[in-house]
Amino acid sequence: MKFSQILLLLMVSASSSLSGDDRPNIVFLFADDWGRYASAYQEIEGPQSINALIDTPHFDRVANEGALFSNAFVPAPSCTPCRSSLLSGRYFWNTGRAAILQGAVWDPEIPSYPLELEKSGYHIGYSYKVWTPGRPANAPYGAKRTAYHQGGTNFNRFSQYTSAKAPQSGVEEAKEDLYEEVRQNFDAFIGDRKEGQ
């Protein structure tokens, strides 16, 4: 079993000037292969689980103070169809070619929540995999226009990267490299916001 791989960080920041009220910031984190052994779920299986290497104290705190789903199911057994459902709010078979693993094409007639948030004044951005393998030009979250990969994209291959680097410099240094990459990507997103967002 591979380590949990966070493949999505969809970042959204609110603009309070559009509606006159203080709208919340939204950070949507979506992961492939999260599994029952990862982070907050680890307590269910015990501290000696196979993913004990991955320490996610902030995610765990949010999960413990909010809702933690321990019996949830995806609408499809593959990443792209599942993600097309999450992005659109539709069953994957109602998203047409957007549910195809390789060569997915988004139908612009199907609304997606990231672009709807952007229309209402939110600053949106993403880092790492969001919908389908590769970087499709018509992605339903702004595609290249909203990408924040300035720090790199090695986090997409968390377990492969740490496994390759760990023998020379240790697991902690390998993990820190990846965390720094994530911080740089997020800082670039924050730096791009317009005033009031």
Where do the model's predicted regions map?
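Formylglycine-dependent sulfatase
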Residues: 2, 11, 18-197
